[in-house]
Amino acid sequence: GFRGIGGTIGFALTFLIGRWDPRIGMAIGFAAMVAAGLWLMHFDLNVSEEALLWNAVLQGISVGIIWVPLTVLTFKTLDREHLPEAMAMFHLLRNIGSSLFISLSVAEIIRSGAMNYSRMTEMISPYNRTLQLPGSMGGFGMETVPELAKLSGEITRQAAMIGYVNGFGLFTAASAVAIVLVAFSGGRGKGA
């Protein structure tokens, strides 16, 4: 998809960045990931498909830029006889790390969505004076079961969006922390 197109562009950009210390390329990639995350955090329920696609391209570019220097730094100090085991461990740890972060993100989306649904439904009451003002309910009502179901559906959409924005915040924060970790990681190592 579009993230793959971005990844291809990111891999191509590593030819330009490859002359520098690999940590610089990784920092640039994670900075692009932070930019993508901040962009995601500003989406709302009216986000366009085009904005989502361009964000996927930016995420792909960032992963493409990160991947090559990360792989180079991982394997450049190893002797050839250890490469097969190191490659297996590298991919195992990458998969475990990805799975863990995806699980944490989904848990945050669900937790935050449920919490916000609960808080928003507390405000919906025939005794809430604000909701008694003319036009305050828009196209929603609280008199019949179908009206309440429609209102509940809208609250669910709004709460889910808040959950996703919080998940995107987690993604952005993790990328920003990665920049700091890259900056404080060791130098070029042997063979550089």
Which role does the model predict for each range below?
Residues 1-82, 191-192:
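Transmembrane core module of solute transporters
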Residues 82-89:
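Cytoplasmic loop-to-transmembrane helix junctions
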Residues 89, 94-187:
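Hydrophobic transmembrane architecture of multi-pass small-molecule transporters
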